[in-house]
Every structure is written in C-alpha cells, then in structure tokens.
C-alpha cells in the first residue's frame, strides 16, 4: 500500500488462507513475507507459538526480521537470559519505559530474575502479548 514494503490487509487475509509465503516487489526490491497466522487468538505452545514468536511475527509483518532461536521451556530457571543475550545482536536497545513508543517490545520478569516474557506496546496503555495457557491477545495493562 502506498509504495511501502508490506502486505495490505487484503493481502494478509488471502495469505493466511493460502498458508504460503508471499513475495512483494516494491520500488525495485523483492520482499518475502513468510506466512504469519493472525496475531491474536493463537494457542500457546512454548517455542512454537509463544510470546517471542508473537513479537517476531509482528515485527516480520512490519518488515523487520528477528532471528528464531531454540528455547527450552523454563530456560530462565536454568541460568539462561535468552532475551537479553539474543536481542542485542539484532540491533534492539533499551529505552526507559516513559519513552516507549507503539511497536516497542517490553520485556517482563514473571517469577524470574531475568526477562522471560515479551509484549509489544500498542500505545494508549495496551499490549499485544501471549501468556502461557491463554490465547494471544491485545489488552490494557
């Protein structure tokens, strides 16, 4: 839309139905969009459809590629710090919460001394996130 390198809403609906990657040519460049299911209403499966997958998929739809990395359940209880260890290599950097912009990733510590949950700040006090044993959703915090 408007010469920008991302799929339109109609393209996304058709892509989800087809369950295939789509290619888009924009301003002479070719962009590949892997098939990403709807961001809300996903069932939670650690390492497959979890909070990291949700934010990775949301960023992909915005044209930003984040690496996938193997993660075992409860990695934060076994001395790993996967978010901080892996995200710095992608070019992300820490900002104060007061400076958060829509689209920024918020890292949270749930019963852990290291960040073990990621959420996307949507603006106006809303987050997009995926908690174990719940469907992914957008909600006020």
Regions of interest found by a model, annotated:
Residues 66-71:
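Surface-exposed patches in mature extracellular/periplasmic domains of secreted proteins
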Residues 39-47, 94:
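Short helix-to-loop capping/linker segments positioned immediately adjacent to catalytic or ligand/cofactor-binding
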Residues 9-11, 72-136:
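...with weaker cross-activation on analogous glycine-rich loops/strands in unrelated enzymes
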Residues 44-62:
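Active-site nucleophilic cysteine motif
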Residues 2-3, 25-28, 108-114:
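Short, flexible beta-strand-to-coil junctions
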Residues 1-10:
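Short HxH-centered metal-ligating active-site micro-motif
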Residues 13-37:
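Divalent-metal-activated hydrolytic enzyme cores
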Residues 138-141:
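Short, Lys/Arg-rich amphipathic alpha-helical interaction segments
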């Amino acid at each position: 839309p408007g010469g920008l390198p991302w799929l339109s809403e109609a393209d996304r609906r058709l892509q989800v139905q087809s369950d295939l990657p789509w290619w888009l040519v924009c301003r002479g460049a070719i962009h590949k969009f892997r098939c990403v299911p709807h961001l809300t209403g996903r069932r939670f499966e650690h390492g497959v459809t979890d909070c990291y997958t949700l934010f990775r998929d949301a960023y992909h739809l915005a044209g930003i590629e984040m690496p996938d990395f193997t993660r075992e359940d409860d990695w934060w209880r076994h001395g790993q710090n996967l978010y901080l260890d892996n995200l710095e290599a992608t070019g992300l950097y820490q900002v104060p919460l007061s400076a958060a912009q829509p689209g920024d990733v918020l890292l949270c510590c749930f019963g852990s001394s290291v960040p073990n949950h990621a959420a996307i700040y949507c603006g106006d006090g809303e987050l997009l996130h995926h908690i174990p044993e719940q469907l992914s959703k957008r909600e006020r915090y």
